[in-house]
Amino acid sequence: MKLSELFNPDEFAARHLSFGDEAALLAAVGEKSMDDFVGNTVPQSIRMPSELDLPEALTEADALAKLKGIASKNMINKSYIGLGYYPTRVPNVILRNVLENPGWYTAYTPYQAEIAQGRLEALLNFQQVCIDLTGFPVAGASLLDEATAAAEAMAMAHRVGKVKSERFFVDARVYPQTLDVMKTRAKYFGFELVVGDFAQADEGEYFGALFQYVGKDGDVQDLQDVIGRLKAKGTIVAVSADIMSLVLLKSPAELGADIALGNTQRFGVPMGFGGPHAAYFAFKDEFKRSAPGRIIGVSKDASGKPALRMALSTREQHIRREKATSNICTAQALLANLAGMYAVYHGPEGVKRIANRIHALASAFADALVSDGINVVHKVFFDTVTVDFGNKEKADQVFAAALESGYNLRRVNDTQVAAAFHETSACEDLVDLYRAFTGKDTFAFADDVKGRLNAELLRQDDILQHPVFNRYHTEHEMLRYLKKLEDRDLAMNRSMISLGSCTMKLNATAEMLPITWAEFSDIHPYAPEAQTAGYRELLADMENSLKSITGFDAISFQPNSGAQGEYSGMLAIRRYQEAQGEAQRNICLIPKSAHGTNPATAAMLGLKVVVVDTDEHGNVNIDDLKAKAEQHRDALSAIMITYPSTHGVYEEGIRDICRIVHENGGQVYMDGANLNAQIGIMQPAEVGADVLHMNLHKTFCIPHGGGGPGMGPIGLKAHLAPFAPGHALTDTHSASADQTAVAAAAFGSASILPITWMYLTMMGKQGMEQATRWALLNANYVAKRLSEDYPILYTGKNGRVAHECIVDLRPLKAESGITETDIAKRLMDYGFHAPTVSFPVAGTLMIEPTESESKAELDRFIAALKQIKQEVLKVGRGEWPKEDNPLVNAPHTASDVTGEWAHPYSREEAVFPLPFVREHKFWPSVNRVDDVYGDRNLVCSCPPMENYED
């Protein structure tokens, strides 16, 4: 035995990829070796000139040990910084059974409602929490963060408002990170932001206004009068409200506002150096068709039973493109589920106890300071005590004393220091903080504390009265409720999810473990830089890896989603061109096949979209591109192009596309949705891209979470790097100091970056190259096998596809009347989530199997689609009626096959159509959901409790 051969640093790659299937897969596609296969699939013209510059792989154990060493360089102080981020306690039953459970975190956005009823109910619970606390009748299923939500509120106010003005008022008490993001958005919308005293907001003419409730320094103001005066003038009013304070305070709706927004992080979601967290967004009923993001609604299924679904999707970017209300796709579903379940578990009395405890501790601390002659700035506050020492030296001394005792305070200005209390604050903290503020060792506080909130500020209405918030307060009950919901959903712990353009690959357990380590989860985003050395090292490691993979000169990690990455990349181009004196460049070329986020993003940046034709092979029509680039050469800003194309093909003309745009004065933005087909084969920067967004939740193993979180960092060439997103409170070490932000936290959802770090570290140089090759091989295997039954719509070199393929169902539909939707729903009876339906071409399925699926799983999926083809043919031949067959009736529930049966097909054909289905049957919990009924009868709050009964 050779000892060296018994250590296996590549063990993880062998878990991520199915090396044992290689020969059979290659034989099926007519190749003898992987090198031959890649050579015959990928155009030589795009191949990268050198190998990836990445370290060799580490084992799972070694990678975890190395990451633990990095994490240990973060210093966990007790955080009293506030500014929208607070220590909290994640209930362990929720931590283990939701956050750490692949049944929840590996699911996709619930487009296929029949196999997503569990997380749809969880998101409906979240919406109900937001409805109860804000007082509005409608709330969304989360936005990316509070600052983004504020910017969306500003945009929505302009859409729905009647005041003919381009001016928007911002309360001077808003969080600085919120104002920073609003400045970015306002510039390209053409809005003028006016920041001022909240009490004087009605002295100008504004289309909208935003107030902070509670203020950034802790004060609670009665906003009712000023809101009333603004409303009398027709101004749309938004309130950014602390979610925990709303447990006690009057709701924004009662104050007279139109929109409420904020962060739900305090409801059991760790700070995580800035994210991810779910923002809430609630509003008046008349605004529902202008609202951004997802909304969960109650509808009914084909049998008339209540069923949940995503409602009003015609507002969204994939439908309305440049006319969409927002470019948001992925939001923060998993974090919204955590926050909603926090309210379910604690119930109304539990959250009131927590909110009152926070307020009582802050009040007791303020009382002690006042009795000691210290100037507490605000008499009325919820959780934050701001002190003015009158001189800088004393403020420095107190800040340093607290730091030495292990407490992070916030420095408000030269003479003021603030302490923000929170759920984990304890009585001993009062003693330590009192010592830091006064220099005295003893602190005696009374058990009976008088609060600092005036009676007229407190809410009188009841909250969280729905039975779901009053039933699951023991751990057994909560555990079983979570399991019941999980069992209604089909996630990747059950079967492959082959959604094209979504890259649903393995989210390995070793990758997920570190996100709940305290060294990552318990760090405030504005903690002193000396306390975040571990995060800085992690970011530097990842920047180096991503630069090697993509060929770019700089990386910005701030964007919180792919859509926000798009916005950030195009924003860098706009800023660069303005700095070059070319602000007139406002034309954006977008291929006809592009994802809807592309035109929506361009419109948000004030760009005019010019559509470029595609040819019969799905490629960009080079002649049309050249003509339009030359026509608009003096105004050409950029092209937004996806590579490989949205049609799943390597376009051989990509270098020509980039050259033509550059020759006509434009920049090249590459959409990185399909980056999984590039790593180790080509580099976007090397073929001519100037900026690229990367979906870490696709290519780099961050799970989709049932609709978020995501991360969309951007890679930039050197000339664009200074124009990446900056930040008002944190040095990003990339953007120039005067650049405003796109997200609330400087490094976006930093606490999920360890997932990608682990993936890169365990795969290493060779593993990352192999992953791309296997993604191509699996896709071509699926395409080859399915081509026997279905036309493959687009192929490239040698009849090959890239990492995904488009199956054309239109001929079958024409023959039989069976639709792509019928086939998608029928796949549920076989235990599979449908591929992407009718995108980028109506009447098709786009399939992306990814590299991490075994041949056995691919064969089951292929067998399902082949059997479905035979079922469709039966309908076409008249053996089954068009109005009564297993496709139009799909999916079938257990209730269907245990009740009366009058169908022309058997129960077995309905629910066990192939032998393998018996081994691992997934039962949809509802029949086909009625989308039209749901939109016409929109209900976005929790239905009566009897609907929850089994």
Swiss-Prot record:
Gene, per the UniProt record: gcvP
Record-listed E.C. numbers: 1.4.4.2
InterPro entries: GcvP, GDC-P_C, GDC-P_N, GDC_P, PyrdxlP-dep_Trfase, PyrdxlP-dep_Trfase_major, PyrdxlP-dep_Trfase_small
GO molecular function, one term: pyridoxal phosphate binding
Chain's role: The glycine cleavage system catalyzes the degradation of glycine. The P protein binds the alpha-amino group of glycine through its pyridoxal phosphate cofactor; CO(2) is released and the remaining methylamine moiety is then transferred to the lipoamide cofactor of the H protein.
Cofactors demanded by this protein: pyridoxal 5'-phosphate
GO annotations of cellular component type: cytosol; glycine cleavage complex
Keywords: Oxidoreductase, Pyridoxal phosphate
Family (UniProt): Belongs to the GcvP family.
GO BP terms in the entry: glycine decarboxylation via glycine cleavage system
This protein's name: Glycine dehydrogenase (decarboxylating)
Catalytic activity line of the entry: N(6)-[(R)-lipoyl]-L-lysyl-[glycine-cleavage complex H protein] + glycine + H(+) = N(6)-[(R)-S(8)-aminomethyldihydrolipoyl]-L-lysyl-[glycine-cleavage complex H protein] + CO2
Quaternary structure, from the entry: The glycine cleavage system is composed of four proteins: P, T, L and H.
NCBIfam families: gcvP, PRK04366.1
Keyword Secreted: no
N6-(pyridoxal phosphate)lysine carried by residues: K698
Xref: Pfam families: GcvP2_C, GDC-P
Coiled coil: none
Domain of life: Bacteria
